[in-house]
Regions:
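Nucleotidyltransferase catalytic core that binds NTPs
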Residues: 1-138
């Protein structure tokens, strides 16, 4: 009998503009949910001059690593959206991918599963909750 060892990854993706202590709860949830699988925190590339996305990607990554050194090696910046992230993860050899989002975003992010088998292929792909968002997290 052949034993198949699937390579799994858990990830989250967000603006994190700017990174806050409230985001740390999301980061912890990704780590804890991964249970032995690889896990990453993707920082969006979004930046504008309107005030809601003031940090450019490099500056945001710098602050995230300074604020959360325990998560520093798991931060990634580059792919601009969840589909691009999943394409990247597939090229890295992952078989299973779990997109971890706040409970208020689970339904809204189900659309990524429509691309499985088209733009990328994962044996298992799901969108799961990191838990309820802390309204007071700053």
């Amino acid at each position: 009998m052949e034993i198949v060892d699937y390579k799994c990854v858990y990830f989250t993706f967000g603006r994190f503009q700017p990174p806050t202590t409230g985001h740390a709860e999301n980061f912890k949830a990704v780590k804890n949910t991964a249970k032995g699988c690889d896990w990453f925190i993707y920082l969006s590339q979004t930046v504008d001059n309107k005030g809601s996305n003031p940090l450019d990607p490099d500056r945001k990554l710098y602050y995230a690593k300074k604020m959360f050194p325990n998560f520093a090696k798991h931060f990634r910046s580059g792919p601009k959206d969840p589909v691009a992230i999943l394409k990247e993860l597939q090229t890295e050899g992952y078989d299973d991918a779990m997109f971890v989002v706040g409970s208020d975003r689970v339904q809204a992010m189900q659309w990524v599963k429509r691309y499985n088998g088209k733009d990328f292929f994962f044996r298992k792909l799901d969108v799961i909750s990191s838990g309820d968002r802390d309204a007071d997290g700053d």
